[in-house]
Swiss-Prot record:
GO terms for biological process: proteolysis; symbiont-mediated suppression of host innate immune response; transport of virus in host, cell to cell; viral translational frameshifting. The N-terminus of helper component proteinase is involved in interaction with stylets. The central part is involved in interaction with virions and the C-terminus is involved in cell-to cell movement of the virus. One of its GO terms (molecular function) is serine-type peptidase activity. It comes from the Viruses. Keywords: Host cell junction, Host-virus interaction, Hydrolase, Inhibition of host innate immune response by virus, Protease, Serine protease, Suppressor of RNA silencing, Transport, Viral immunoevasion, Viral movement protein. This is P3N-PIPO polyprotein. The keyword Ligase does not apply. InterPro entries: HC-pro, HC_PRO_CPD_dom, HC_PRO_CPD_sf, Pept_S30_P1_potyvir, Potyvirid-P3. Belongs to the potyviridae P3N-PIPO polyprotein family. Signal peptide: none annotated. The keyword Ribosomal protein does not apply. A motif (Involved in virions binding and aphid transmission) lies at residues 747-749. Residues 292-437 form the Peptidase S30 domain.
Length: 1152
């Protein structure tokens, strides 16, 4: 059967659990094994440890380690009695024994260790009996054992008279008792012999041991270490060895002589005392009686001294023998007079025993403490930091207190919730875990030091050393404290309240009054504390940082104080914060920075607007939040499934479906409805995806769209009014300025899809159209916009709205109307039905290639890559109807053709038609390849004044194409065309005049450059100035688009290569530029050469004619001299003799 006493394995414990129904775990088994290792008893039920010696209860091994202090058990006499002696000795029979005296003369003795029946006769044959010996007898004589009883032979008895038998029986009883006593004595001697033998090593160890006092006051032997004992043994052996070599023979000394002569007392003669010839003093010596005190008088003295100490709170010191002393003072705690002893932890020492009070001095301390609140009962909650050293009555303390071994309890601190006695010995670990209850001043400095070291900066790059004097540091710290706070005591609450109630100005005045004196004091007495001086100067600067310019504040408030619009509202708030000066909080300063940021944004946006709508910074992100449609959220207009209720609007919607929608027959398939055609292109619907494939691969393939070419962000994507962008009438871009392209739109049946931003909203078609599928006829997809407006029309006005839309709007719009006309029609309808201004539009896609708007219906779109119009409501769409709107999309067809779109007049700049473009060699369908022929046209017109005049009149912006080549620009400058353009267009078109001025300036800079690379860099740098002029011209023409494209290409090329050029790299385009320059210069290079030849011929002919005319007028006799003079003048003018007219030429001219 399993028991817990023989539980050596875990399975034993589990077997015990099964038999007895207990629930002991492995933790119990581990604690049981730990108890066996340290010699403790483990209580399985209470889960505690019990000491077998002191019977103390402990809950953990840590408590045993910290608090268990009992000694090992002392030896007992029973420990030295063998197991054989522990057995009960046989009790001899004290009845009558008949002893037969043999004839042998040897003395017979009795053996009482043999258990023999009473009637048997015991016989011994030996000389003596040795009691209490378990070894062989020392005598050599054999011991004759008692013969075994013979059952067959009858016992021999001797009949005697009755009285002698009784007397002999009494004598034998006495002898038996005496023998038993001797046996007991022998056993006791044997036990003590074993005890002496076992204690011999222990007693020998005590010869070298010292006596020490334990914590409980008991005196114990403290043995020396093994190395000390070995050292003493060697020393004793050495002394014994020397004694053996020189043995000492004792002798009696009966006479002492000095050098063999007589003693000094015999040889010295007695001298007579000298006579003092002075008058003896008449002063009588006072002999004080020696004070002798008994125990009663000493007790009274201690009581009186204790009363004085406690009442006056004086310090005292009780001194004992040698260096024993106890220091303390009288104090009060909660109105009770107590004795406070000086402990070690108050001096900064953490020791196991905080204070040692000798036994002889403890009674005196107790008597002094008894003169105060000795009989007051104390609880642990009444003791707190600052109570260190308080002497309490051990019998009058209640609560969580540690071990109490003496009549007095000296407070030390708290650990694990218990108050510890300073006289108790604790472990080294507890000394560091204990919260010492030292006094307040010590706590202050301990807290200061701890916090100072804890908050030491972690980014110090050097090793700190003690360079300043500690006393000087304390002095400077006191100066700083008094300068900033000016307290009578740092613990004074009234000073703190008075300081708190000071206003900001009063506090600044109070600190300013003292800070100058403190700075001077530190400069003179502590000049090494330069960091403190910098801090004080900074404090002084902050306190005096006041803004007294109230005049400017009032003037600003007067000028724009009533303006609530931006940026004036930000200026007003910033003005209110700045006037506060140093009274402004950090939050207000942060708000001031935000106001400055808003002002900076305003001026930045204003600057960008001044730049005439540059596309570089154009951003038109779509809102991430879906538009709230109140009509679709009103519970009164929703059915039980949350769908929109058309009501009477459903009946009147037939006017749209009957005339402008085509019914789809699904039985014939959707193939003929897939392509949505318009006069200038087509778009592929996603209606075919209504046939859903359950195969994942096929379905994923049906979700892939067919993208078109992206034209990028151009001026076609934006709309402006007054030079500012009208964002609802622009294409949507991402946060980087790239146009957002449309994705595939999946189809649905019997729905009206609303929402141009965010997630689409699906509205069920009217009940009259239920079960049928409708698609708008070609050219009438804008009817979906009117159908979306019908959702917000009240039911009683639905008839008027549909009639007006059909008879007025649709009748005038017809097929493929322009966006301007559609917006105008929406504005007319919204004027009579204002609720439709907030109507949500279907998604509208922009196709810049075909100049078309696509209004997406419920059948979606397979074709992707279109731009998205941002307009989401009717109010935003109506902006396209404004005449002041500058937008190409304003004239796009809603499913129309670009050639039919009306164009605005170009003002002073004429617009080229199709025929004119063909005459110039330009193809309007591909503008990318039209730069070269127009540039060739410009090159031809450089030295042809009439062609140049015609070119400047029709397409003046072709001059900007000259920046492609430095040679072309220089030729254009030298021909005077730029000067002519500046003067002709100065009054009519200042933009063209400014363009010519910029080209002239670039030509001058190019002429100074020595290499083609530098010349191209100059032209690319000047492209930005030309782009600013081309941003918003008065009209549109082909030359403008070509010039704009050329300038943007050069700017993009410069920006792309800027980083490479800055770091020293060169691009491979330099060689390409040389080839292009040769190619372009070839056109006008031959022309220049021909002009040079013609100029040479004309010059020579003119000189010859002039020379002949002069020769004919001169004297014939001096013709030879005149000829030489002409040659000399030609050499002087041309610096070349071959250019001077020759004599033959003169002669021929004379002959002619």
């Amino acid at each position: 059967m399993a028991t817990l006493d023989n539980c050596t394995q875990v399975h034993h414990m589990f077997a015990y659990n099964r038999e007895h129904g207990t629930n002991y775990t492995r933790n119990h088994f581990r604690r049981y094994l730990a108890a066996q290792r340290i010699g403790f008893y483990y209580d399985w039920d209470d889960d505690v440890y019990e000491c077998p010696t002191c019977e103390a209860i402990y809950h953990s091994l840590d408590e045993i380690k910290n608090w268990h202090e009992c000694d090992p058990p002392a030896f007992d006499l029973n420990d030295f009695i063998t197991d054989a002696r522990l057995k009960s000795a046989p009790v001899p029979d004290l009845g009558p024994v008949i002893v037969e005296t043999p004839k042998v003369e040897e003395k017979q003795e009795l053996n009482f260790f043999a258990a023999t029946p009473a009637p048997e006769v015991l016989q011994w044959k030996c000389r003596g009996l040795q009691f209490g010996s378990f070894t062989e007898l020392e005598t050599s004589e054999p011991v004759v054992s008692a013969p075994k009883p013979n059952c067959e032979e009858p016992a021999r008895t001797i009949a005697k008279p009755e009285e002698p038998v009784e007397q002999e029986t009494c004598g034998d009883g006495k002898r038996l008792l005496q023998a038993q006593m001797e046996v007991d004595k022998a056993e006791q001697d044997l036990a003590f012999a074993y005890l002496s033998a076992s204690l011999k090593p222990r007693l020998e160890g005590r010869t070298t041991a010292t006596i020490a006092r334990r914590r409980d006051g008991c005196l114990v032997y403290k043995t020396k270490p093994s190395w000390s004992q070995r050292k003493g043994t060697k020393k004793i052996l050495k002394v014994d060895t020397l004694a053996c070599k020189n043995p000492y023979i004792p002798a009696v000394v009966d006479k002492i002589s000095i050098a063999g002569g007589s003693s000094a007392s015999v040889m010295h003669e007695q001298q007579k005392p000298k006579i003092l010839h002075t008058t003896p003093s008449r002063k009588v010596a006072t002999h004080y009686k020696r004070t002798v005190m008994n125990q009663q008088t000493l007790t009274a003295l201690i009581n009186q001294v204790g009363t004085i100490i406690l009442n006056a709170e004086k310090e005292f010191e009780v001194v004992g023998c040698r260096k024993q002393k106890v220091t303390g003072k009288g104090t009060r705690h909660n109105g009770v007079r107590l004795v406070k002893l000086k402990t070690a932890h108050e001096e900064g020492h953490r020791r196991k025993v905080d204070i040692r009070i000798p036994n002889g001095l403890r009674s005196i301390v107790t008597r002094i403490s008894a003169r105060g609140g000795w009989h007051k009962t104390w609880t642990d909650s009444e003791l707190s930091p600052g109570s260190s050293g308080y002497v309490l009555n051990s019998s009058k303390i209640i609560g969580e207190f540690g071990l109490r071994r003496h009549s007095i309890f000296v407070v030390r601190g708290r650990v694990y919730g218990k108050i510890i006695d300073s006289q108790s010995k604790v472990t080294h670990t507890l000394t560091h875990r204990m919260v010492q209850y030292s006094d307040v001043a010590r706590n202050f400095w301990n807290g200061y030091s701890t916090c100072f070291m804890h908050n030491t900066p972690k980014d110090i790059l050097h090793t700190c050393t003690s360079d300043f004097d500690v006393k000087d540091c304390g002095t400077v710290a006191a100066l700083l404290t008094q300068t900033l706070f000016q307290f009578g005591k740092i613990t004074c609450g009234k000073c703190a309240i008075e300081y708190k109630n000071l206003t900001r100005d009063e506090l600044a005045t109070r600190v300013n009054k003292e800070i100058d004196g403190t700075i001077i004091s530190i400069q003179t007495q502590h000049p090494r504390f330069v960091h403190v001086l910098n801090f004080l100067r900074l404090i002084k600067q902050v306190l005096n940082a006041k803004n007294g310019n109230f005049g400017a504040f009032q003037e600003t408030e007067r000028i724009i104080g009533d303006r609530m619009d931006a940026p004036f509202s930000h200026v007003n708030k910033l003005n209110a914060i700045v006037i506060k000066g140093n009274q402004a909080t950090s939050d207000e300063m942060a708000q001031a920075s935000n106001h400055v940021l808003e002002i900076a944004r305003y001026f930045k946006n204003r600057t960008e607007n001044i730049q005439k709508g540059s596309l570089k910074s154009f951003r038109n992100k779509i809102s991430g939040k879906a538009h709230l449609n109140p009509s679709l959220m009103c519970d009164n207009q929703l059915d039980k499934n949350g769908g929109f209720e058309w009501g009477q609007r459903s009946y009147h919607a037939k006017r749209f479906f009957d005339g402008y929608f085509e019914t789809i027959d699904p039985s014939d398939g959707y193939s003929k409805y897939t392509i949505r055609r318009n006069p200038n292109g087509h778009r592929k619907l996603a209606i075919g995806n209504l046939i859903v494939s359950t195969n994942f691969e096929s379905h994923r393939r049906s979700m892939v769209g067919e993208p078109i070419e992206d034209p990028g962000l151009t001026n076609q994507c934006v709309s402006k009014e007054g030079g500012a962008f009208i964002y609802p009438c622009c294409c949507v871009t991402d946060e980087y300025g790239k146009p957002t392209l449309s994705e595939i739109k999946m189809p649905t049946k019997h729905h009206l899809v609303l929402g141009n931003a965010g997630d689409p909203k699906y509205v069920d078609l009217p009940k009259e159209a239920e079960g049928k599928m409708f698609v708008a006829k070609d050219g009438y997809c804008y009817i979906n916009i009117f159908l979306a407006m019908l959702v917000d029309v009240p039911e009683d006005q639905a008839k008027d709205f549909t009639k007006m839309a059909r008879e007025i709007a649709v009748k005038q719009l017809g097929e493929w109307p322009s966006m301007m006309d559609v917006a105008t029609a929406c504005n007319i309808l919204a004027t009579f039905h204002p609720d439709t201004r907030r109507s949500e539009l279907p998604r509208i896609l922009v196709d810049h290639a075909t100049k078309t708007f696509h209004v997406i219906d419920s059948y979606g779109s397979i074709t992707t890559g279109y731009h998205i119009l941002k307009a989401n409501t009717v109010t935003q769409l109506v902006k396209f109807a404004h005449e002041s709107l500058e937008s190409e999309m304003q004239h796009y067809r809603v499913g129309g053709e670009p050639d039919k779109a009306p164009r605005k007049p170009a003002g002073n700049v004429p617009t080229l038609g199709i025929s004119d473009l063909k005459n110039l060699g330009v193809e309007s369908e591909n503008e990318e390849h039209s730069i070269r022929p127009n540039l060739q046209r410009l090159i031809k017109a450089i030295y042809r004044p009439r062609m140049m005049r015609s070119l400047l009149t029709e397409e003046p912006y072709l001059l900007i194409l000259s920046i492609v080549s430095p040679g072309v620009l220089m030729a254009l400058y030298n021909s005077g065309s730029l000067e002519r353009t500046m003067h002709e267009f100065l009054q009519t078109d200042q933009r063209l005049s400014a363009t010519a001025q910029i080209l002239k300036h670039l030509a001058k800079k190019v002429s100074l450059a020595k290499t083609l690379t530098i010349q191209n860099a100059i032209l690319e740098g000047g492209a930005g100035s030309l782009n600013e002029i081309l941003d918003a011209p008065a009209g549109r023409s082909l030359s403008y688009r070509l010039a704009k494209q050329t300038v943007e290409v050069m700017m993009a090329r410069s920006d792309m290569d800027k980083e490479l050029v800055d770091v020293g790299f060169s691009v491979l385009r330099d060689q390409k530029n040389e080839l292009i320059e040769k190619k372009l210069s070839h056109g006008f290079g031959g022309l220049v050469a021909r002009i040079a030849i013609v100029w040479k011929i004309i010059s020579n002919a003119s000189l010859a004619a002039m020379a002949g005319h002069l020769y004919s007028r001169s004297n014939p006799n001096r013709c030879r001299r005149f000829e030489r003079q002409i040659q000399y003048l030609g050499w002087v003018c041309f610096q070349k003799r071959d250019l001077a007219p020759k004599g033959n030429l003169l002669r021929r001219s004379k002959e002619s």
